Amino acid sequence: MKKTYIRALDLRHGSVDLSHGGGGRAMVQLIGEVFGRAFDNEWLRRGDDGAVLPAPAPGERLVMATDAHVVSPLFFPGGDIGCLCVHGTINDVAVMGARPLYLAASFILEEGFPLAELARIVASMAAAAKAAGVPVVTLFVARTFATFSGGFGCCPSSTPRR
């Protein structure tokens, strides 16, 4: 069945409005057209609020880290808030002795934030996640701009904890 929306999403000149964080059709459209295209994978295609992931192998433990990124400016020499979010979270999992496996992401978007800049940040996150081989398997969008992320990995049971 084809999804229908009230209006087309103008990724070049449009901006985020309150309906994009309201849980309705506008949010579904934003997630599908911006996030879904960039992070496309089997978990996100299901459209669920979470992801059911395989259990760690026998002899391994699950490692999880969470992070938040609020920086100004959002784009800076050498990167942006998107790649910082992915690399920072993957690093937090790795320093615990784990092999990063999955990412969860939350976006708090300000009303009026340019959709072109959002698409650029999401593309940067997707490129960083793809380069690391760590997919974003669940995400959330709400109102006002910040990124939050969680990372999951596995490590041998014998790995010492800090």
Which stretches of residues belong to each language-model region?
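N-terminal glycine-rich phosphate/pyrophosphate-binding loops that anchor nucleotide-derived ligands
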Residues: 1-95
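Glycine-rich anion-binding loops of enzyme active sites
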Residues: 62, 69-70, 99-162
